């Protein structure tokens, strides 16, 4: 066991995989840099951003401004867009050479593909969809995530293996304020690819031309649950949202019923949101839903059941029938906003 302990001491610093698409750094990477900064400060270590892409080095300074001390940049045609094998090879090489203590990855479609590959190749643990990350007294990473269908929060530790790896959904962590004066270093990496393992080639990318709204970006959300009932009920929520320049979102029940699309779902199996104002309309407040919205700045809940758990997190609660309350609220807000 002494060898394990000796081994662990060789690993240090908090690394963040910086996801980029079409040369644009994704918001989840900026959020993870904010969390990495907190973790590294409590360990007295550095934050290292790992940026993979092609002709992408100009993004390094932005990563320093958001909390990175070092940016490792691999600039290669092989990395122009995400393909599993080249990306997995590149990061595996970085980890073997640099020995990070912690690696954080966004739980996006890319991160969910990359994380398990790295975990297998590096023979270390991976905790997916973490909602909390902290450092223990033993300097281990405490990774908290919902377990047993979200009815329990489990804190997981990767005691004997390094790096400690975690994926985190977009919107869960808070980004740091951008500081243009932060100083950091940028290092260009040379990746030795084993191209014989490259089995996949991207021939074409076809983007879905849909007028999709990203509810994680909304300042005000009007969210409907089972109590709203049907499409007609959601049309009333749309009206209410219109008076506040808000977006409409929903609980899982309404997505399962086919009334709302999945990209509007708030909760553990949907999106995590932090708007300034969140209306929970006819939502009882299952723990899975709360996990996706309880960090909202101000929560207004309307529910017929005065014992509904949603009232435990609401700043303002109205016990009443959503179908009656929403039109009254819409009328009142429309009058106020006209003023």
Predicted region positions:
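N-terminal glycine-rich FAD/FM-binding segment characteristic of electron-transfer flavoproteins
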Residues: 1-339
């Amino acid at each position: 066991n002494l060898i394990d302990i000796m081994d662990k001491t060789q690993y240090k610093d908090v690394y963040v995989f910086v996801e980029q698409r079409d040369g644009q750094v994704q918001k989840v990477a900026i959020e993870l840099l904010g969390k990495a900064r907190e973790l590294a400060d409590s360990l007295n270590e550095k934050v290292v951003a790992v940026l993979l892409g092609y002709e992408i080095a100009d993004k390094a300074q932005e990563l320093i401004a958001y909390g990175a001390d070092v940016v490792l940049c691999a600039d290669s045609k092989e990395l122009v867009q995400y393909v599993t094998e080249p990306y997995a090879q590149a990061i595996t090489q970085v980890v073997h050479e640099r020995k990070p203590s912690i690696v954080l990855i966004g739980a996006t479609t890319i991160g969910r593909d990359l994380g398990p590959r790295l975990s297998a190749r590096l023979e270390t643990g991976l905790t997916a969809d973490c909602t909390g990350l902290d450092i223990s007294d033993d300097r281990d990473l405490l990774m908290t995530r919902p377990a047993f269908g979200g009815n329990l929060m489990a804190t997981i530790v990767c005691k004997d293996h390094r790096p400690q790896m975690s994926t985190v959904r977009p919107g869960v962590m808070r980004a740091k304020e951008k500081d243009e004066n932060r100083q950091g270093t940028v290092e260009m990496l040379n990746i030795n690819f084993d191209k014989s393992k490259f089995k996949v080639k991207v021939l074409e990318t076809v983007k879905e031309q849909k007028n999709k709204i990203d509810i994680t970006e909304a300042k005000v959300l009007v969210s409907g649950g089972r109590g709203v009932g049907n499409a007609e009920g959601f049309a009333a929520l749309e009206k209410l949202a219109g008076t506040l320049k808000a977006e409409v979102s929903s609980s899982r029940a309404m997505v399962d019923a086919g009334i709302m699309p999945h990209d509007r779902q708030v909760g553990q199996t949907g999106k995590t949101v932090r708007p300034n104002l969140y209306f929970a309309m006819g939502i009882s407040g299952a723990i899975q839903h709360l996990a996706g919205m309880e960090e909202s700045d101000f929560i207004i809940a309307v529910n017929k059941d005065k014992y509904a758990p949603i009232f435990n997190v609401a700043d303002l609660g109205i016990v009443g029938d959503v179908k009656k309350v929403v039109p009254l609220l819409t009328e009142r807000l429309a009058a106020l906003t006209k003023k």
